[in-house]
UniProtKB/Swiss-Prot annotation:
InterPro entries: Arrestin, Arrestin-like_C, Arrestin-like_N, Arrestin_C-like, Arrestin_CS, Arrestin_N, Ig_E-set
Molecular function in Gene Ontology: G protein-coupled receptor binding
Family classification: Belongs to the arrestin family.
Protein's recorded name: Arrestin homolog
């Protein structure tokens, strides 16, 4: 008989935790990033653990809040505020008010592990809540950055309206993100524009086509540019940009930033009657925009997993004009310089920049690349974990760990 060897792979579940300054209350969350699937949003499922004989008749409350900052703190004068803070959900966690609560798998495992002093809670995002976005501040900005942030707060008090003491309260910053659809589709975005001249016959034709409609963060954009010069003017050079468009709905403000660019004179000058065809490649990423004011991110640059803010998606039947918060979109812009008297010829081709959906091959590939690039960080984090072999649960302090964090 040939002996059979079975290899069992045990996958540890990472759980994030944060404890109040007095060490009496600890909050556990299974994740920090919650995904908007358009038809539903991942629930915020967590556990609160309270030390024995600490409450003495008091209660533990929790709430989900969002902070929408659309103006600088330095400009807030004479009582004028450029921020809106809204409580999206609030409930009493300890003692529980619900007779029976449906638990998620991670809550069941944590309840079993943490014992009788563990109490579950669940919050839900409203259907129209915006995604998390942070606008990169400038060098002179001293206050909090503009953007949309979410947090889960728990505190100890006698009633829900009581703010609670800082020593018995804990706040956990979370993010609400959107992922790309499971399939990207076969549509190839394109644009065709022409430019005529007042005192000259003929036109310059510019056609730009992208190789796909949806790109994942870190992927290379390929733009096929075709120029036909049927005029008497000459094309001096070509500029290609990836443009990030931001709309701050609260104040109806719109602005754009270049997150990737190149300029070339290859094939130039394109003289009358000539044609030019070339594929240009650009990679928009947060790492190349560290010093750019106003760039929209899905976190902070000090976090190693930060990306450019994803394109804003809306559910079927709705328009992006119905979105609230900070609406993000992207386009690839090609600009031709036709000389001093000829002016410029420009066109924009819109596309979407998103995270790959969980379970897709692109998602697995992205996770593998990210893991390879952060081996040292992983070793650092592993030294900070407290693992449990019985339940395969790994606890990590909720604060984002950084290799270069000062002591």
């Amino acid at each position: 008989m040939i002996p059979l060897l079975f290899v069992v792979y045990v996958v540890a579940v990472k759980v994030f935790k944060k404890t109040t300054p007095n060490g009496k209350v600890t909050v556990y969350l299974g994740k920090r990033d919650f995904i908007d699937h358009l038809d539903h949003v991942d629930p915020i499922d967590g556990i609160v653990v309270v030390d024995n004989d600490y409450l003495r008749g008091r209660k533990v409350f929790g709430q989900l809040t969002t902070t929408y900052r659309y103006g600088r703190e330095e400009d807030e004068v004479m009582g004028l505020k450029f921020t809106k803070e809204m409580v999206l959900a609030k409930e009493q966690i300890v003692p529980q008010t619900k007779e029976k609560m449906e638990l998620t798998p991670i809550q069941e495992r944590l309840m079993k592990k943490l014992g009788p002093n563990a109490f579950p809670f669940t919050f839900h995002f409203p259907a129209s809540s915006p995604s998390s976005v942070t606008l990169q501040p400038g060098d002179d900005d001293q206050g909090k950055p503009l953007g949309v942030e979410y947090s889960v707060k728990t505190w100890v008090g006698d009633h829900a309206e009581e703010k609670g003491h800082k020593r018995s309260a804990v706040t956990l910053a979370i993010k609400k993100l959107q992922y790309a659809p499971p399939t990207r589709g076969r549509r190839l975005p394109s644009s065709l524009v022409s430019k005529g001249f007042t005192f000259s016959q003929g036109k310059i034709n510019l056609e730009v086509t992208l190789d796909r409609e949806i790109y994942y963060h870190g992927e290379k954009l390929a733009a096929n540019v075709i120029i036909n010069n049927n005029s008497r003017k000459t094309v001096k050079n070509i500029k290609v940009y990836v443009v990030q468009h931001c709309e701050v709905t609260m104040v109806n403000a719109q602005f754009s930033r270049h997150v990737a660019s190149l300029e070339t004179r290859e094939g130039c000058p394109i003289t009358p009657g000539a044609s030019f065809t070339k594929v240009f490649y650009l990679v928009p990423c947060a790492a190349s925009n560290k010093d750019r004011y106003g760039i929209a991110l899905d976190g902070y640059l000090k976090d190693d997993d930060v990306n450019l803010a994803s394109s804003t998606l809306v559910s079927e039947g709705k328009n992006t004009t119905d979105a609230i918060g900070i609406v993000i979109s992207y386009s690839l812009r090609v600009k031709l310089n036709c000389g001093t008297l000829g002016g410029e010829l420009q066109t924009d081709v819109p596309f979407k920049l998103l995270h790959p959906a969980p379970g897709t091959a692109e998602r697995e590939k992205a996770q593998a690349i990210k893991k390879m690039k952060s081996i040292e960080r992983t070793r650092y984090e592993n030294s900070c974990y407290a693992a449990d072999d019985d339940d395969n649960i790994v606890f990590e302090d909720f604060a984002r760990l950084r290799l270069n964090e000062p002591e």
